[in-house]
């Protein structure tokens, strides 16, 4: 692990953290009873991005990128942006305030939406990859 790699992850994490803060502030009005601002725009979007980018940028994907770019986006940016630790604390706060129903909704919605978002990101990028492979195969066949 080089200093450059650490720097790449650190910068991505800083940008992801700043984005998380800005989105959290903007989502405060809708987060009065259940922390929807954390669930939807942060954890679900971050999960979609990591699934989409991770699939689209594989070596055999439509847009392969360097390992450093994957580290920047997937570990740095998404790691700083998504907030599982915040989700856990918010859920514990709901439980400590005897809001078990709201805590249960928070857990279920977070898990279901985030796993669904990763799957949707993967499926969407896989469609891009498959389309790129078909286009490349058609072009190769036409050249032959």
From Swiss-Prot:
Na(+) binds at residues 79, 82. It is a multi-pass membrane protein. Fluoride-specific ion channel. Important for reducing fluoride concentration in the cell, thus reducing its toxicity. It catalyses: fluoride(in) = fluoride(out). This is Fluoride-specific ion channel FluC. Keywords: Cell inner membrane, Cell membrane, Ion channel, Ion transport, Membrane, Metal-binding, Plasmid, Sodium, Transmembrane, Transmembrane helix, Transport. GO terms for biological process: cellular detoxification of fluoride. One of its GO terms (molecular function) is fluoride channel activity. Na(+) is not transported, but it plays an essential structural role and its presence is essential for fluoride channel function. InterPro entries: FluC. The keyword Transport applies. It comes from Gluconobacter oxydans (strain 621H). HAMAP family: FluC (MF_00454). Its main location: membrane.
